[in-house]
Amino acid sequence: MADNPGLPTDTENPSTTFTGITAEQFLTQYAIRQRISDAIETGYTDNELLAYINDAINMTWGVMIQMDYDEIAGYMTMTERKMEIPKDYWMPTGKPPVQRHNHMLYCYGDLPCTFRYWTRPKFLRTLQDTLPQGMAWFNPALLNLVAQMVVTLAMQNHGFDMGAEMDFTTSIAKLLPK
């Protein structure tokens, strides 16, 4: 747990102790396959469902950036003028004296230079991959919204009218605290 400071550490309460949830567990726990009404019986492949989960993660991640969720930010201190970009780096949250070129960051200001950056979400390639880690992603309300988004995206892409469901999901998302 020490490697994941954003995760709950209350080991006396299993419902608040997370080690990760795989795509397969997510599909099962949130009954995604059962919730998708496939009246035209086209079926949804694992790869399609993974793509819908990734789309939902990406949309949620974008909203979390707009809402300035610190849970999806990283912090970096540059002690040298040139450093390799961390694997989870996406972009700085502000305007630090740092430039990105290929896989390197260059500091043109005073050292050491500490700045905050948005992390890149982890996308799923297989059913055994885990959803993004961190307290924000393991909020049950957020996982329910991601599940509803997956169902809505899957059904919309197969021609079902999901306008009301998407409006409902959007309304609930607006109620979540920052």
Predicted regions and their residues:
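Glycine-enriched, solvent-exposed interface loops adjoining structured elements
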Residues: 2-178
